[in-house]
Amino acid sequence: MSSAIESWADAGDEFSVPADIIQNPDGTKTVITFRTNQDGKKVKITQKIKEVIVREKVHPLIAQRKNWAKYGKEKHSSPGPDTSTTQLGEKVDLKLGLSWKQVEKKEEEDKAQERASRVVVQTIKCRVCGGDHYTAKCPFKDTLGASTLNGGTPEPGSEGAGDADAVTSTGRYIPRHLRPDANGNIPTREARDDSTTLKVSQLNTFVDEDMLRNELFARFGPLQRVTVVRDRETGESRGFAYVSFATEEIAQKALDLLNGKGYHSLILHLEWSKKKKPL
């Protein structure tokens, strides 16, 4: 009884036939083999092979280094680098010369010309607001009125005057809260109430909002705001913070208890963020 075939590779070897190689007059050779496909049928495979010898010309020093004898653990290895022990890097062609400054200057000039070609020259100017669009498509045409279009100016204090102030000579839009009124005054937003805010200075750089809230000011009840002032570029603390309390009485109590106390190797200095008016 024949033994069971354990793998498909063994099954292929059982039906394999030695290859028939035919040398052709043109230097090629034809290899004919027989194999069994997935359906269990025996198929004939014909391959025409042409051997091409590629000769690469290298520098004599490179050829000399290839003939060096290997040593150490690679003493009995075959010629050439072994990918298991040698990491092959990318081939870099180094071109030496004295005109590298001229080449860099030319590259900079090409980049400058490319940037200049991308600049769009403004050829369209609106007669109403001066923007880079057609007058008929001006978004401020209805608000500025026909007087601006005809060369006149709206009367001060009118709705058209307020909208006209919203657009500068360059066509930039000015928000309403930043426009001057009829008297030339710029309205200001309501100032934030900092009457219960303390400025805490002389802090260590690693102190953050959570440390201030939990280690220093948690005993004084809920806090409205804790902000450590940081550098915009590095994000590192600048050594001071602002803490807002629920009432002025609680803030005064924290000022009296913590001012001049030590905290992480530094002496705290607490003061009101906004100067108090004398009574």
UniProtKB/Swiss-Prot annotation:
- From the UniProt entry, list the residue stretches annotated as the region Disordered: 69-90, 149-193
The family database entries (SMART domains) matched by this protein are listed as: RRM
Enumerate the GO terms in the molecular function aspect.
RNA binding; translation initiation factor activity
Alphabetically list the UniProt keywords: Cytoplasm, Initiation factor, Phosphoprotein, Protein biosynthesis, RNA-binding
Q: Does the keyword Cytoplasm apply?
A: yes
Pfam family example for this protein?
RRM_1
- Could you list the residue ranges forming a coiled coil in this record? none
- Write out the GO biological process terms: formation of cytoplasmic translation initiation complex; translation reinitiation; translational termination
Q: Name one GO cellular component term.
A: multi-eIF complex
Q: Where in the cell is it found?
A: Cytoplasm
The RRM domain is annotated at: 196-275
Q: Which residues carry this modification: Phosphoserine?
A: 77
Can the keyword Cytoplasm be found in this entry's annotation? yes
Any stretches that span the bilayer, and where are they?
none
Briefly state the protein's biological role. Answer: RNA-binding component of the eukaryotic translation initiation factor 3 (eIF-3) complex, which is involved in protein synthesis of a specialized repertoire of mRNAs and, together with other initiation factors, stimulates binding of mRNA and methionyl-tRNAi to the 40S ribosome. The eIF-3 complex specifically targets and initiates translation of a subset of mRNAs involved in cell proliferation. This subunit can bind 18S rRNA.
Give the record's family classification. Belongs to the eIF-3 subunit G family.
Q: How does it assemble?
A: Component of the eukaryotic translation initiation factor 3 (eIF-3) complex.
Name the HAMAP family on file.
eIF3g (MF_03006)
The protein's name in its UniProt record: Eukaryotic translation initiation factor 3 subunit G
Q: Which organism is it from?
A: Lodderomyces elongisporus (strain ATCC 11503 / CBS 2605 / JCM 1781 / NBRC 1676 / NRRL YB-4239) (Yeast)
Query: Source organism lineage?
Result: Eukaryota, Fungi, Dikarya, Ascomycota, Saccharomycotina
Q: Source gene?
A: TIF35
